[in-house]
Structures are given as C-alpha cells and as structure tokens.
Amino acid sequence: MQLLDSPIFELSPIAMWLEDFSEVQKQFDLWRSEGVEDIASFLLEDKSRILSCAHKIKVLHVNPQTLKQFEAQNFEDLTANLAQIFKADMSSTHLNELVALWNGETLFENTAVNYTLTGHRLDIRLRGTVLPGHEHDLSLVLITTEDITPYANAQRLEEKSRLIAEARFQYSPTSLWVEDFSRVKARLDHLRRLGD
C-alpha cells in the first residue's frame, strides 16, 4: 500500500488511522435494496443501527502519533481497547459520518469526545477521506484525529464564566445595572493632558 510505504504516515504529527469501511458499504447496499432512502431518519429510528455500523469498521493500521495520543502501548493494545476510547455515546457524531458516506461524499469532518486508554478525556476533530480508488467499496479510509482539548476546555470555561456573569445579574438581591463610563474617562484623560 503506497500510503504505508511513505514516511509521511509514520512521521506525521497528527494521529492517523487507516480503516476499512467495506462492511459498512455492504450494509448500505442491503438497506438500499430494502428501499431505504433517507439514511439519517432510518438510523435515528433505531440508534442500534449506528452502533452496528461502527462495529463493522476495521482498523487496519495507525501511526505512532495515534498510539501516543491514545496512550496505547502498541497497535494490538489500541485495537483491543477501542471500547474504552469510544465509550461515550458517539451516535450523533458517527451519524454524520455515515450520512456523508451514504451520500457518496469522500470527505467528512466532526468533533467528538474520545478517551485515552488511561481514561483521560480527549476532545478531537476527526477528519476522514476515502482514498482514491476505494470509493466504490470504502475499503480504505484515512482518518485523522486532532486533539483540540485545550481549545474545547477554553470554550467550556468561557461559557461557564458567561453563565455566572448572567446569573449575577438575574438573581442579584439588589438592583444592578451596567453603565458605560468610557466618555467620562476620555473627558478626564483629556483634562489631565491639558493640565500637564
């Protein structure tokens, strides 16, 4: 496989996974033959279908950065413990990937929550691309997982601070208001400069 022969895969600072979605494609073909047209609605009717598709995906290879990111000793350690990595409800994020692939798209992107093998939360940006020549059977899909935990933590902290500030105004036992004194300050600064 040309991608695996390239040092770029092994040396990439981004976690990369090569996965085989061909069993998912076979499931899609079966559902199409049964008359399914709106895959999103069909999957949401019974979310176990999403989980079933997830279990059909085979991890073929990962790069060293993937092992590092998920705190795995080796490929076997990682693949034997995928349930720990994907332990949260991933149906909503996985749904978007399945809909994209069902619609013939060769690129998809999501944010999701994964966990390292030692239990640390990872907020990730997942990007996937069906490699050229494999569009018909989805047998080779390149997935990257970028750790965006610091960014996500900052967003959560900002949201928490905003909610606390709003609550102080809404539930204060005394009257509170906000005034803009910037014009007063500008005038005082102007007078101070004139006095110097």
Identify what each model region corresponds to.
Residues 76, 82-113:
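Terminal output helix/cap of sensory domains in signal transduction proteins
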Residues 17, 60, 92, 97, 108, 110-122, 125-129, ...:
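PAS-family sensory domains
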Residues 63-66, 194-195:
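PAS/LOV and allied N-terminal sensory domains
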Residues 23, 133-136, 140-166:
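Sensory coupling linkers of modular signal transduction proteins
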Residues 118-141:
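Short loop/turn elements at sensory-signaling interfaces that couple input to output
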Residues 1-48, 52, 156-195:
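PAS/LOV and related PAS-like sensory modules
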Residues 66-78:
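PAS/PAS-like sensory domain cap-loop motif
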